[in-house]
Amino acid sequence: MDNIDRLNYLYKQKKTLEFKINIVLTEMGLVKNKDGKYEELIKQYNKFNQELYDVEIEIVTRGGV
């Protein structure tokens, strides 16, 4: 998988996680955390964000793909 494919994959995963986080927040009514779902999603989201950032930096520092 090249960097562009990786970037596209990560962006897709990020959007999916944002959607799931919004569903969990809606289900919780922003009041309480059910079964630790929110924390787990936030961990995943942060992990993908970090990987996305790393790939973007790698692309920029290498001057392209």
Language-model segments: which ranges?
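Short, charge/polar-rich alpha-helical segments
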Residues: 1-19, 42
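Hydrophobic stripe of amphipathic alpha-helices that form coiled-coil interfaces
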Residues: 17, 24, 31, 38, ...
